[in-house]
Amino acid sequence: MKCYFFGTNLHEQKLISRQGLISFTVPDYGVLFRAQYIGNRYECEYAAGIALIRFLQLNMEHFDGKPITLMTDSPIVVYQVNNKLAAINSLQKFRDLFLFYKRKLKFDLQWVPTKMNRAEMGLEGLAVNKNSPRFNFDIFDESTRRKTRPHRNADESVQIS
């Protein structure tokens, strides 16, 4: 079963750690997930893959026994995880976590051109599957938790003039 992931930051200078987007899709089940993520381009790419892996792990009853191939347009993630390129220090924890899950869940990781990465595309390329099972999306933990900005307390009043 092919599963796709995509991550990017939304700043024109992609290596600056700013607001980004992570996305994954499981087309066979009509699943599309998107969330904001703070990080540079490569951190967002890794976070998208880790979010997909955690989704697969949480919902293994729907994927067990099926060969799983993760597809991404990130050559950095593919080459580092497949040991063709050394990971720089800032990406080491992401790569190590990816390798841990790869050994545990036994999936393949392949590069795909951006125009074929279904997680990067809009909704029009995703079919609705009315028979899709109910999935658990509780995929964030401390290593990939979305960073949030402090919110005002609910009891604080706002003055409008």
Where are these regions (language model features)?
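Acidic active-site catalytic centers that drive phospho-/nucleotidyl reactions
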Residues: F6, E45, D73, E120
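RNase H-like nuclease fold core
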Residues: M1-E43, F55, I160
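Short, flexible active-site-adjacent loop segments at beta-strand->alpha-helix junctions, enriched
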Residues: N9, S74-I76, P113-K115
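Acidic/histidine-rich, metal-coordinating catalytic segments
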Residues: I68-V78
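A structural signal for isolated positions on well-ordered beta-strands in alpha/beta enzyme cores
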Residues: K2, T69, D108-Q110
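Acidic helix/loop or adjacent segment enriched in Glu/Asp that either coordinates divalent metal
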Residues: L32-L70
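C-terminal functional segments of enzyme domains
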Residues: K14, Q80-S161
